[in-house]
């Protein structure tokens, strides 16, 4: 019996650290509205993502996708490098 896998979450972010082996830290920015003042504020979340070939560098814009837990904190993997750092 085949099971269909649900749609996995994807995010676009910027690599802020590539110091680890096969892992990068990706900062994903989102905009939320302040509950009282209704001003739109930027909020940043950092995700640890699997980078199999150590291709990503700091400043690269990447697409990450949710995956099974790979370690204690790593649940995302780099799918594609959208834009290289200058």
Curated annotation (Swiss-Prot):
UniProt entry keywords in alphabetical sequence: Ribonucleoprotein, Ribosomal protein, RNA-binding, rRNA-binding
The family this protein is said to belong to: Belongs to the universal ribosomal protein uS17 family.
GO CC annotations, alphabetized: cytosolic small ribosomal subunit
A single GO molecular function term of this UniProt record: structural constituent of ribosome
Keyword Endoplasmic reticulum on entry: no
Function per UniProt: One of the primary rRNA binding proteins, it binds specifically to the 5'-end of 16S ribosomal RNA.
SUPFAM superfamilies named among the record's database cross-references: Nucleic acid-binding proteins (SSF50249)
Alphabetical list of InterPro entries matching this protein: NA-bd_OB-fold (IPR012340), Ribosomal_uS17 (IPR000266), Ribosomal_uS17_bact/chlr (IPR019984), Ribosomal_uS17_CS (IPR019979)
GO biological process annotation, one example: translation
Pfam families registered for this protein in UniProt: Ribosomal_S17
Organism: Caldicellulosiruptor bescii (strain ATCC BAA-1888 / DSM 6725 / KCTC 15123 / Z-1320) (Anaerocellum thermophilum)
Gene3D superfamilies: Nucleic acid-binding proteins (2.40.50.140)
Domain of life: Bacteria
Quaternary structure and partners: Part of the 30S ribosomal subunit.
Protein name: Small ribosomal subunit protein uS17
Family matches, as NCBIfam families: PRK05610.1, uS17_bact
């Amino acid at each position: 019996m085949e099971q269909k896998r649900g749609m996995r979450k994807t995010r676009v972010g910027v690599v802020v650290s590539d110091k680890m082996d096969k892992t990068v830290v990706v900062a994903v920015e989102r905009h939320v509205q302040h509950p009282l003042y209704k001003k739109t504020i930027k909020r940043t979340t950092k995700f640890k993502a699997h980078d199999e070939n150590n291709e990503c560098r700091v400043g690269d814009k990447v697409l990450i996708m949710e995956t099974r837990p790979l370690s204690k904190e790593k649940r995302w993997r780099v799918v594609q490098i959208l834009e290289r750092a200058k």
